[in-house]
């Protein structure tokens, strides 16, 4: 390895199975070792079939998602690992994977399935996207999609803008790590969007955490 060369040159991508334990996700064992959230540091942690993960395992991510680190305490002492990762999750709308109007699951079963993910954890996921059912004509239609290379260039450009915005700050490295004071500095709201956000807070009973994320 040459002088000044980084040990890791690519952002990690981790996709643990839904049977992972809390020690496997956060880290642990007798001699504390990093878990999946630390192995995904500065990269992506992808959780597929999110409601299939044990609820107590998912809940352990709440504090690391906010703080960007996790502390493992054992009898011999404690150790803090970095865990500033991007959480990407996917799930079906119903237990059998069908759309709500076509599912054979009862309303109670669907509600129990969705309630496996707590509100506080959902508050820590900044973007939610509902994917509609794709029709056969859309699947078979001949049309060119945007190439991955073009998307990659947009992502790189966005990252570079964020690096310039925060001017080498150790505490804030990207938009997701901004706190309330950073948002006020870099993303001041005009009166109209501020009023819209106030209405949403009142109508939807949004939490303070969601207010900061949406602002």
What spans do the regions from the language model cover?
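Short, flexible hinge/linker loops that cap or flank conserved catalytic cores
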Residues: 17, 31, 37-38, 79-81
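Basic, amphipathic alpha-helical bundle interface domains used for macromolecular binding and assembly
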Residues: 32, 56-213
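Short clusters of hydrophobic/aromatic residues that line enzyme substrate/ligand-binding pockets
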Residues: 13, 25-26, 37, 70-72
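Short, basic, glycine/proline-bearing loop/turn elements
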Residues: 19-23, 101-102
